[in-house]
A protein has these predicted regions:
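Buried hydrophobic packing residues in well-ordered domains
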Residues: 52, 70, 88, 129, ...
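Non-catalytic accessory/assembly modules
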Residues: 109, 140-142, 152-197, 201-216, ...
């Protein structure tokens, strides 16, 4: 469980030394300077167009991806009462043609051809459109993007199609617990509030009616709400801010001036006099939760004082004496988070969300009593300046060493944030902590009382008496019982609860290490027989952070479902054992992960390097002697079984992909086998298994970042001395990939409890050779956009439609997937095959220039800049796992792609894609779609394990 992190900010008097103001444009419409981190070398220009559109321009001469986002201050909360989902449908329609670019899909094809991505989302109070693209094509993308907001066509033919896609999205997510929870929760809200409506829409709410065509409603909504003064635009590119400004003025000043009618955010979220409320919700998956949601005034204007962040840090604490630690000791909770929930201009919520065990749900009243006892304790003795000062120091460090984010992520976040914060604080707002304000914090704490509570209980065993209209959620809603209200409003205390102490992991030494290096890539250091360290001193990101990985590979990790389950439980027990100790480290920017994998388990420590050795030593001690108590084991065992059962309730396309990988890899086990093994596991079996797992191992480590060679060796020595000891060295090879037979497709039919059908078609590659991988990647690149355009936009087969290259242990392949509410698997497969044959003509007619563009775009993706140290570390770690010790896998793959000629690619497409006598697999499910009885007889895989065992293998990459 991870607390919702709320970073503090710097003191105003530190701005001169800790932040750098960016230049701004002044033309009678000036804005203040933008506060940026010292590590940020971009240029910024904030500007307002003549039509009122607010713009932020960002110049980054080094970026390989340009990006833009436009946010409109209108969303589903402004849907007409009789047209739920209208704003969402409008969002879809803007992608389907404008006066200047009338062809549906032309914008997306242009973006994808030039190595980009595009998307949009609709929220109750705003709608966000965004894209990224290879830097040199920004101008062309903006020309197309701007027309969304100037001259959208709303072609009647595409309205009918896209209404079907919106309905497919609705259908696909009918069993999504996230959407179902929100749908039920909204039954308690004031129907006038933007958050209360049915946001997605479906074929009924968006249907044409006599005298009321949905196209007319779309145009009316667009003309009323898509106004420049209600929009914010962020553009990031290599060009100067002045040139970017000139482009934006030229392209976006055609957006109609004026301001839209704002959503009714002045309406309280809950009708007056209805709180406190108790709501019970039955989920699809086996999930148990208690959400204590408190109605509060909006905290947006108090962002510089961070009252909610302060409160969240104490209520969400996971250290000794915390509410979470106490609940976990009782066996009642698996996780806890605290922080702001809904946030609007006038009203919001503060929420404490607790993931419960079965017994925890039964004892929700005692849990509530302890929560309110803690709130009283904080009010009486916990509002102190030292906590505030510590949070400010943490924020000062994080802001000083703020890492870059992808352009795609940055622009969409800033465009949305511009509605709520002064432009000068777009970066700084999450970090800003101006002054400790005890009275303000206490005023918000006073709102966290039972009288302001909407308690939501989620669990499969709850009793309910109502059914929500759109998603069919079973729920109940009533006034919080008077005895519960009286109990929680009393003055009870809990002596086992106490407030956190000062954080011992706060980084002190933040100096960048100096090291003489002959090469700028990891170098090998043999620590002992069977244990290798790879070391790379890297301060090129200007950050005192580092990533230390160690993988323990064992021949006993996953050869059976039992071993796989026990390895998983071992990692879970140790992580749980260390949670209270490591939580302060996490807050201080020093985290760890412990996870099992196909050959054993990996420990990763990441963050500021100053106190990593302290954390590592404690983790190693726990790995050596895990505390397998009955309470801990039972709780984690139940949690694992619950997770495995819930896999059968994932989206059909997710289940199809997961089953495909199980059919192809001999170290991945089916959930039913793992459930059986997990239910049979005992604490005694786990205790006996750990020495067996560790007795003979192969170990490899990576220290990458702000380390000297001596510091890296010291960390490795801790691993050798504290964990490995005199354990025997072993060689643990990779798992192997099943070699499919060249024949008619083998078909695996799943029984998935979901109304949608799904079909995944997988074409297996011939070898691990780079030349083969390059061709499969090119095929995925070339077909991605047209496959989507054909099967989703034109044929309306479903909401989840995608295709692309799919590696399995570096063996290339292609996968095509459609999840459909109205098409049976046979029809989906036929459409896929027809697409491939039709697209062969496009490849035959493809020009050298077009092919070169696809090839260049793919190379750009392969060679994309690694914006963060962690991205480079992840690549190094993957290359180490693959025994790719040149650390130049990207360069070699890019070279192989560049060597593929158009003639080579045409031959490959004919022999490896169109020839379905080649090895391929089909995974499907019929759902509630008709056609299962009429399906053509196929070469069915009845016993998947026997199928996998009967086939040959590709040699793994390390053999």
């Amino acid at each position: 469980m991870k607390l919702l992190r709320y970073l503090a900010g710097l003191l105003v008097f530190l701005l001169a030394t800790a932040v750098t103001p960016a230049q701004h444009y002044e033309a009678g419409q000036a804005v203040a300077d933008i506060i940026t981190s010292p590590s940020d070398d971009r240029d910024y220009l904030a500007h307002r167009l003549k039509n009122g559109l607010r713009v932020l321009l960002i110049s980054d001469p080094h970026t390989d991806k340009a990006a833009a986002a436009l946010d409109v201050r209108v969303g589903s909360g402004s849907d007409p009462e009789e047209r739920p989902g209208l704003a969402h449908l409008l969002e879809h329609m803007l992608f389907l043609g404008t006066e200047r670019y009338p062809e549906a899909g032309e914008y997306q094809a242009f973006i994808q051809l030039h190595g980009g991505n595009d998307n949009a989302y609709t929220m109750p109070d705003h709608t966000n459109y965004y894209f990224d693209i290879e830097s040199q094509y920004l101008r062309g993308a903006l020309e197309r993007f701007s027309q969304f907001f100037v001259a959208a066509l709303f072609n009647p033919r595409f309205i009918e199609r896209e209404r079907g896609i919106v309905h497919a999205e609705f259908s696909a997510k009918l069993q999504s617990d996230g959407r179902r929870y929100l749908a039920a929760r909204r039954q308690a809200f004031d129907p006038r509030h933007p958050e209360s409506g049915f946001a997605v829409g479906n074929e009924n709410t968006l249907a044409d009616r006599e005298g009321d065509l949905v196209r007319e409603d779309l145009i009316g909504f667009y003309e009323a709400h898509y106004r420049a003064e209600s929009m914010t635009l962020v553009v990031l590119g290599r060009e100067s801010t002045v040139l970017l400004r000139d482009w934006v003025e030229e392209l976006f000043e055609g957006v109609p001036a004026g301001k839209a009618i704002a959503p009714q955010t002045e309406v309280p979220i809950y009708p007056l006099g209805t709180l406190p409320l108790l709501q019970k919700i039955i989920p699809v998956k086996e999930i148990r939760q208690a959400v204590f949601s408190f109605a509060i005034p909006s905290a947006l204007d108090d962002y510089a004082a961070k009252p909610l962040s302060y409160i969240a840090s104490l209520l969400g604490d996971e250290g000794p004496g915390s509410l979470f630690a106490l609940l976990k000791e009782q066996g009642w909770a698996e996780g806890l988070s605290a922080g702001g929930g809904l946030s609007y201009e006038h009203y919001g919520t503060f929420e404490v969300t607790i993931s419960l065990t079965e017994s925890g749900l039964e004892n929700y009243q005692r849990i509530g009593a302890w929560l309110f006892a803690l709130i009283r304790q904080i009010s009486e003795e916990g509002v102190t300046s030292w906590v505030f000062d510590e949070q400010r120091k943490l924020a000062e460090i994080d802001f000083r060493f703020r890492e870059d984010v992808e352009a795609y992520t940055l622009v969409r976040a800033f465009a949305a944030r511009m509605h709520d914060y002064p432009v000068q604080d777009l970066y700084y707002a999450p970090y800003r902590y101006d002054k400790f304000n005890r009275e303000l914090i206490l005023s918000y704490l006073d709102r966290l009382q039972p009288r302001n509570l909407h308690l939501l209980l989620v669990g499969p065993e709850l009793e309910t008496d109502q059914v929500e209209t759109h998603y069919g959620v079973h729920y109940s809603l009533e006034t919080l019982p008077s005895d519960v209200l009286e109990d929680w409003s009393g003055l009870s205390t809990n002596p086992d609860l106490y407030l956190p102490k000062p954080n011992p992991f706060l980084a002190v030494d933040l100096e960048l290490r100096q090291e003489q290096l002959e090469v700028s890539k990891p170098t090998r250091i043999d620590i002992q027989d069977g244990f290798t360290l790879w070391f790379d001193h890297d301060t090129s990101y200007g950050s005192p952070r580092g990533n230390f990985y160690v993988s323990i590979r064992s021949p006993h990790a996953r050869t059976t479902p039992r071993e796989a389950v026990l390895t998983n439980l071992y990692a879970a027990v140790v992580a749980d054992q260390l949670n209270a100790f490591s939580y302060p480290a996490q807050l201080a920017g020093l985290g760890f992960e412990l996870y099992d994998h196909q050959r054993g388990f990996t420990l990763k420590i990441s963050g500021y390097t100053d106190k990593q050795a302290v954390l590592l030593e404690t983790i190693l001690a726990a790995l050596r002697v895990p505390e397998v108590t009955s309470e801990r084991f039972d709780r984690l065992q139940d949690n694992l079984v619950q997770q495995l059962r819930n896999l059968a309730l994932e989206q059909p396309y997710e289940q199809a992909i997961a089953d495909l990988r199980r059919l192809l890899l001999d170290t991945i086990w089916w959930p039913n086998a793992k459930i059986e093994a997990a239910e049979a596991a005992t604490p005694e079996a786990l205790v006996a298994f750990v020495p067996q797992l560790l007795e003979s191992v192969e170990s490899v480590a990576l220290a990458h970042g702000n380390y000297t060679r001596e510091e890296a060796l010291s960390l490795a020595a801790l691993v050798a001395g504290e964990l490995l000891g005199t354990n025997r060295a072993a060689v643990v090879p990779h798992g192997q990939v099943v070699r499919l037979a060249a024949s008619e497709a083998r078909v695996r039919t799943l029984s998935i409890d979901h109304p949608d059908a799904v079909l995944a078609l997988y074409l297996q590659g011939e070898s691990h050779e780079l030349s083969d991988r390059a061709k499969y990647y090119l095929a995925g690149q070339v077909m991605n956009a047209p496959f989507y355009q054909s099967l989703r936009t034109e044929q309306q087969m479903g909401y989840f439609v995608f295709s692309g290259a799919m590696d399995v242990m570096q063996l290339p392949g292609l996968v095509f997937i459609v999840q459909s509410p109205n098409q049976a698997p046979d029809a989906i497969e036929a459409a896929m095959i027809e697409f491939l044959h039709d697209y062969a003509a496009s490849i035959d007619s493809m020009t050298s220039a077009e092919f070169e563009q696809h090839r260049s775009s793919l190379v750009g993706d392969v060679m994309r800049q690694e914006e963060k140290l962690s991205y480079r570390s992840s690549r190094y770690w993957l290359e180490i796992d693959r025994n790719d010790y040149g650390f130049d896998s990207r360069e070699r793959l890019a070279a192989a792609i560049n060597e593929v000629s158009l003639d080579d690619f045409r031959k490959f497409f004919q022999t490896s894609v169109l020839d379905l006598a080649r090895p391929h697999l089909v995974v499907r499910s019929f759902g509630a779609v008709t056609g299962a009885e009429a399906a053509l007889p196929r070469n069915e895989i009845v016993d998947p394990l026997a199928f996998r065992s009967s086939l040959g293998r590709f040699f793994s990459v390390d053999e």
